[in-house]
Amino acid sequence: LQFGIHSLLFAETFLDKNLPLLDKCKAMGFDAVEIIPFDPDGFPAAKVRAAAADLGLTINTGYGMPEQYNVISPDPAIRQAGIDFSKKLIDLSNEAGAKVFGGMIYCGWGYLTGKMRTADEWRWGVDSYREIAAYAQQNSDLILGIEPVNRFESHFINTAADALRFIREVGLPNVKVHLDTFHMIREEDDFAGAVLEVGNQLGYVHACENQRGIPGSGLVPWQSFFQSLDSIGYDGCITIESFDPNMESIAKLCCIWRKLADSPEQLATEGLKFLRQAYSSVHAHQ
């Protein structure tokens, strides 16, 4: 099992000037870093790959699709733009040596119609993602992680069961479920049950408190969560995802209106210590 940290805790995007962040994350004790290339044309993918290899770090990538790249849009031109942009992000992820590309990569982030998901939207999403996943499969072993998110960010995939149905209908082995405890605590009826239901289709995990603070400081039932991860034999990456309210563009997108720790470094290091201890205590008793 690997423990990772999210680049958005420290930087609003990832450019050449942000490469020292990889050394910093390694020094804090992390095994992996998740990078969001919000400026894809400025993302130094090859340099990330080389630096990570030197440091012994695993790289994962993620994204929240803007509305102009929304593959469940009723506009076929927007859906096609989303497919094309997804392929570009997959190419960048491969160039950076990423193991997983996950997140809200299957519809527009914050796209809400004011109605329940429709059969047309589901079909558009599955058809688009089948093409995207087939493209990814041709070029690498990259895992695509479908992350269920809370109802305030999307009406499309809110639960582990939704994500499972989606990946089964896409039907390609490189598409997995990406669970995030921040969203789970808002949407799931049974924390451990959701993990057990996903089982071997779990490809990636975000470890976030219910309030986006230091893991262990809130309401997430970490013991039962880690017990269920252990039960299914999950051996992938668990990444702490949180954000700094001083980064205005990210804070606005993620609705972070207060300090969640004394510093991003405190959130990262104390969160890592808590998660390692929580996992070890469960794993030792299995």
Residue ranges and their predicted role:
Residues L9-A11, P37-D39, M65-E67, I105-G110, ...:
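Active-site-proximal loop/turn and secondary-structure-junction residues that shape catalytic pockets
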Residues L22-G42, Q68:
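N-terminal substrate-binding region of glycoside hydrolase catalytic domains
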Residues V33, N60, F101, L144, ...:
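Hydrophobic residues within beta-strands of alpha/beta enzymes
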Residues Q68-S73, W109-K115, F152-E153, R186, ...:
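A short acidic, helix-capping loop that chelates divalent metal ions and anchors anionic groups
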